Design a protein with these regions (language model features):
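Serine-esterase "nucleophile elbow" of acetyl-processing enzymes
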Residues: 22-67, 83-91
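Hydrophobic alpha-helical membrane context
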Residues: 14-16, 44, 110
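N-terminal, helix-rich and Lys/Arg-enriched segments in bacterial and organellar proteins
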Residues: 5-7, 12, 29-36, 53, ...
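Bacterial Sec-dependent signal peptides at the C-terminal "C-region" and cleavage site
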Residues: 3-24
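Alpha-helical cap/lid subdomain in secreted, periplasmic
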Residues: 80-216
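Generic alpha-helical scaffold signal
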Residues: 47, 76-79
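Cell-envelope and extracellular/periplasmic
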Residues: 27-29, 33-39, 59, 66-76, ...
Length: 216
């Protein structure tokens, strides 16, 4: 009997070690088009950063990308997308949080204000992640490729990416201008306030774009 019990305990310990060593940690990505999955790979060179993130990890890490084109922190919550992430989140998982591009837009279903509703949504993502035992990481926005001499007031990202704006050539500057304002500051402030890891994606992508130049 003792021999069988010892064998059973050894088996249980072996299974425990095996399941512990093969535990998969998930990185959930929530955000907008700059992180989202893209289709039509053959004809569309555009890639969201969330698409390529898996390539930086081994098979013990799973990247689950929930970022969607056109979403703000507000619409991501209101459409039930955040709840879907929470339902799948387990202790030890990470949530990479990046919004701002569409929070700037004037449309009421998207718009939030930095220092107010935008910050409140970021806090919600952080606090609810922690309540589930997850680890939140805040990012600010990827820069737009705006090589204009002045900040063009337009809520159409596609127009802002073009070299011609309303029929007039606008690239007459070699300086990449900021189009996000306080929306890139808010994630940093919330990260400091709540002691959350912060990734300055604005600076990282600004430096990359600047090194490549206008034609890059």
């Amino acid at each position: 009997m003792k021999k069988k019990l010892s064998l059973l305990l050894c088996l249980a310990m072996t299974l425990f070690v095996m399941t512990s060593s093969t535990k998969i940690t998930t990185i959930f990505v929530i955000g907008d088009s700059t992180a989202a999955e893209k289709s039509n790979f053959k004809d569309n060179p555009e890639r969201g950063w969330g698409m390529v993130l898996q390539g930086f990890f081994d098979d013990k890490i799973l990247v689950d990308n929930h970022a969607v084109n056109g979403r703000s922190s507000k619409s991501f919550i209101n459409e039930g997308r955040w709840q879907k992430v929470l339902d799948r989140l387990k202790p030890g998982d990470y949530v990479f949080i990046q919004f701002g591009h569409n929070d700037e837009k004037p449309k009421p279903d998207r718009h939030t204000d930095p220092g107010s509703t935008f910050d409140a949504n970021l806090r919600r993502f952080v606090e609810e992640t922690r309540q589930k035992g997850g680890i939140p990481v805040l990012f600010n926005s990827v820069v737009r490729r705006c090589w204009y001499a002045e900040n063009l007031k337009n809520d159409d990202d596609e127009k802002l990416r073009k070299t011609v704006f309303d029929g007039e050539e606008k690239i007459n500057s070699d300086t990449l201008i900021d189009t996000h304002g306080a929306y890139v500051v808010a994630p940093r402030c919330v990260a400091q306030e709540l002691n959350v890891p912060f990734v300055d994606a604005t600076k990282i992508t600004h430096d990359i774009e600047t090194s490549l130049g206008i034609k890059g």
